[in-house]
């Protein structure tokens, strides 16, 4: 394991109404993070080098490299001058999963499907979420998104990171994870939820970004019934959420928002 700085204070020249002046601000760190399984690198992403164990577990689950956290027998984080290698040992190397999700190229920030070899893999079929009687109030949706923004410590300093949070009614946010990449932030959150053994069907995942199809895929892989976002969804994200029995809520502004799929899970406060 290794401790990595996730932000840095940098000096710069700023132009204000009074003219040029020396200034400083805190900016997030960014580093190449390699995901390696049984000695083979599967993917390299540019990411904020924090919560790396959560990141590795969440990525492994959402990419279907493992189906249970127990399939990761060992996890080591090794820092090099050029980046970080997260080295995982699988109890039984699932060759078919690794081959099916093979990525040989680096994924830039904000790219959740970069490096996937085919359209079929990018739009892989999802098992629809099981029907459940759980409902959430309009106040729950508003609270999930509002509390996420307030809990983003790194973004408060840098104004440069996305956030993802897991919210349970009556309890509030369980966890918040941040990253320069929205997909990475959600993977980190999924890893945190999995490590704690929480019941995903009892909560809401809130995100600070738009809703693309990859974000829907990851939420469904976690098993959460509701995905709530500050920004708008894509048409493909809506179709995917509908087919997967996921309630997709977007453009959340307090208790005003749009519900695009499976509206019955949301009731008036």
Curated annotation (Swiss-Prot):
Disulfide bonds: none annotated. One of its GO terms (molecular function) is sulfurtransferase activity. InterPro entries: Cytidine_deaminase-like, FdhD. GO terms for biological process: Mo-molybdopterin cofactor biosynthetic process. Its main location: cytoplasm. Keywords: Cytoplasm, Molybdenum cofactor biosynthesis. The active site is at residue 111. It is found in: Cytoplasm. GO terms for cellular component: cytoplasm. HAMAP family: FdhD. Belongs to the FdhD family. Required for formate dehydrogenase (FDH) activity. Acts as a sulfur carrier protein that transfers sulfur from IscS to the molybdenum cofactor prior to its insertion into FDH. This is Sulfur carrier protein FdhD. It comes from Brucella abortus biovar 1 (strain 9-941). The gene is fdhD.
């Amino acid at each position: 394991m290794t401790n990595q700085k996730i932000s840095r204070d940098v000096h710069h020249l700023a132009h204000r109404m009074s003219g040029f002046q020396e200034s400083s601000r805190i900016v997030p760190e960014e580093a190449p993070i390699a995901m390696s399984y049984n000695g083979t690198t599967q993917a390299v992403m540019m990411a904020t080098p924090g919560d790396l164990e959560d990141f590795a577990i969440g990525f492994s689950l959402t990419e279907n490299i493992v189906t249970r956290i127990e399939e990761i027998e060992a996890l080591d984080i090794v820092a090099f001058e050029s980046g970080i290698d997260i080295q995982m040992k699988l109890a039984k190397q699932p060759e078919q999963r690794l081959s099916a999700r093979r990525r040989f190229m680096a994924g830039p920030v904000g790219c959740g499907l970069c490096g996937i070899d085919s359209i079929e893999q990018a739009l892989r079929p999802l098992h629809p979420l099981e029907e459940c009687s759980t409902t959430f109030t309009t106040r729950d949706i508003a609270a999930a998104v509002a509390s996420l923004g307030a809990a983003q410590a790194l973004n408060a300093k840098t104004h440069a990171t996305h956030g993802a949070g897991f919210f349970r009614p009556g309890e509030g946010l369980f966890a918040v994870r941040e990253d320069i990449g929205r997909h990475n932030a959600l993977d980190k959150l999924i890893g945190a939820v999995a490590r704690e053994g929480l019941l995903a069907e009892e909560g809401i995942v809130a995100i600070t970004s738009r809703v693309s199809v990859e974000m829907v895929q990851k939420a469904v892989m976690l098993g959460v019934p509701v995905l709530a976002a500050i920004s708008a969804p894509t048409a493909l994200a809506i179709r995917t959420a509908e087919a997967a029995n996921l309630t997709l809520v977007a453009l959340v502004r307090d208790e005003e928002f749009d519900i695009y799929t499976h509206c019955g899970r949301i009731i008036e406060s």
